[in-house]
Amino acid sequence: MSLSIADQNKLDAFWSYCVKNRYFNIGYPESADFDYTMLERFLRFSINNCGDWGEYCNYLLNSFDFEKEVMEYFSGIFKIPFAESWGYVTNGGTESNMFGCYLGRELFPEGTLYYSKDTHYSVAKIVKLLRIKSQLVESQPDGEMDYDDLINKIRTSGERHPIIFANIGTTVRGAVDNIAEIQKRIAALGIPREDYYLHADAALSGMILPFVEDPQPFTFADGIDSIGVSGHKMIGSPIPCGIVVAKKANVDRISVEIDYISAHDKTISGSRNGHTPLMMWAAVRSHTDAEWHRRIGHSLNMAKYAVDRFKAAGIDALCHKNSITVVFPKPSEWVWKKHCLATSGNVAHLITTAHHLDSSRIDALIDDVIADLAQRAA
């Protein structure tokens, strides 16, 4: 392959742009401090993980052995015996959540999906794509699901097989829906546990809660049926990806044998990226639990620092327990555009992922927020 000088210059300019902005991100959940140079040699191969990593596939260039070890790792931290679980490395959180909702719908074809107003915007798309009945549930002011509204809507509709979409860290506020409370409330309606489905969206917090001293309930041991976590958020990856883990008994219900690849297909996508399982494998194999604890602890400390700085300046700021998402009043456009902040309604947030080794980016942002408030008050 060869490029014209103009095209090569365009690539070189983009390289310089990427180098300059590698660690810019403070407004979105993405860790930029990864190093997968040991995997660069594999980019010369078309690695395709079509089908089930646990079975033979007629496409030989796959990374199934590595994907299996990735799934074994996540089954462990999400507290389900590996032999009783199944999942795969997805294209990202949306596919992971779609897989969970798909399983719920296949188990309960007439069931209604309940999700809160603070749920990620992709779930509304999933509802349309799966053509699944749904009801939007109110959120509490801090972003957590309104359990009274959830139960009222289940009761009013007469739904006997609800499909619950629980947030383990909401997109904007980082709130964690209470898995134990949801199950207790549904049990009080007289609905047995085996008659409803509970999916957990842990895109960011799924790699935080396993490594803190007092995590909120979020695992299979706590009662979930499936869970999704992102690979590019807390772990870090040059290619967006995710991991979904579910109960094998439920997944077996959707398995289809495909003669074209001589394998069973259980996944949403057919051809699947074989490079991202290598990256997730390298990440989990190169970090001990102690190192994850240190990494998560540093991010949590940075979030606390941000909250303390905001409050010292008289600015209201919110950060949930075990969260690295700090919510504060939405500043003027020049501030949120300069710092590439995510905004929603009258709030904005910053996220202290692990590439923020010191407080410099946080300080620069908060200084601008303070200056903005002074300008508006003048």
Swiss-Prot record:
Catalysed reactions listed for this entry: L-histidine + H(+) = histamine + CO2
Cofactors demanded by this protein: pyridoxal 5'-phosphate
UniProt enzyme class: lyase
EC code: 4.1.1.22
Modified residues (N6-(pyridoxal phosphate)lysine): K233
GO molecular function: histidine decarboxylase activity; pyridoxal phosphate binding
Residue positions binding substrate: H120
GO biological process: carboxylic acid metabolic process
UniProt entry keywords in alphabetical sequence: Decarboxylase, Lyase, Pyridoxal phosphate
Keyword Transcription among UniProt keywords: no
One Pfam family matching this protein: Pyridoxal_deC
Family in the record: Belongs to the group II decarboxylase family.
Subunit architecture: Homotetramer.
Protein name: Histidine decarboxylase
Organism: Klebsiella aerogenes
Lineage, highest ranks first: Bacteria, Pseudomonadati, Pseudomonadota, Gammaproteobacteria, Enterobacterales
